[in-house]
A protein has these predicted regions:
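Beta-strand C-termini and the immediately following turn/loop, strongest in propeller blades
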Residues: 1, 29-47, 55, 65, ...
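Short loop/turn segments that connect beta-strands within beta-propeller blades
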Residues: 55-59, 102-105, 146-148
């Protein structure tokens, strides 16, 4: 009919990250459920994968996590406490732990047992189903109530040791220094 079509949606760049070494965008941005004018992005721009808070115009407001460790996964959001639940290896490279990070960048560990933790967050963000293992302990599943100042943990399952009754090797984890004596 001769009427020019107007696009229903317009697109524009929200944020652009460049590096002369390497950029690998692996994780989508996540808008805060309690404030749709802000989003969280994971980036390795400081050498480690960390969380950054941005406004809706793409302006960086704050680096929420920092240090010589890696945010491995953004598990979800606790809307009541306005915090982000993450899995990270902050304490030790072999221990994947669960943390709550508030908008000031303050972190609180949500469980106290060493191991590799994998968690699912409830829709309300108040409960975690935390499944973890260690080389010497079979699978454990806990329900963690993170709505309190100190998380409350209830055991849901502790698997029987499938190797009970067998002679087992001794498991040890350690570090070996490189030629520079540091790493």
């Amino acid at each position: 009919l001769g009427i020019p079509a107007e696009p229903l949606f317009r697109s524009a760049s929200l944020y652009r990250e460049t590096s002369d070494k390497y950029v690998e965008p692996l994780h989508p941005i996540e808008f805060l459920p309690w404030d749709a004018t802000k989003f969280v992005m994971q980036s390795q721009k400081d050498g480690y994968n960390h969380l950054y808070l941005f406004d809706k115009n793409g302006k960086e407001l704050k680096q929420l996590t920092k240090g010589p460790w890696v945010v491995m996964k953004l598990v979800g959001f606790n809307q009541k406490q306005k915090s982000i639940i993450i899995k990270a290896n902050k304490e030790h490279p072999l221990h994947h732990r669960l943390y709550s990070v508030n908008m000031k960048g303050e972190m609180k560990q949500l469980e106290t047992v060493d191991g590799v933790h994998n968690a699912k967050l409830s829709a309300s963000g108040s409960f975690l189903v935390d499944e973890y293992v260690t080389p010497t302990r079979p699978r454990v599943i806990d329900i963690v109530d993170i709505s309190h100042l100190s998380p409350l943990t209830s055991h849901l399952l502790e698997a029987e040791d499938p190797w009970a009754g067998y002679q087992q090797p001794i498991f040890e984890c350690g570090s070996i220094k490189a030629a520079d004596g540091v790493t």
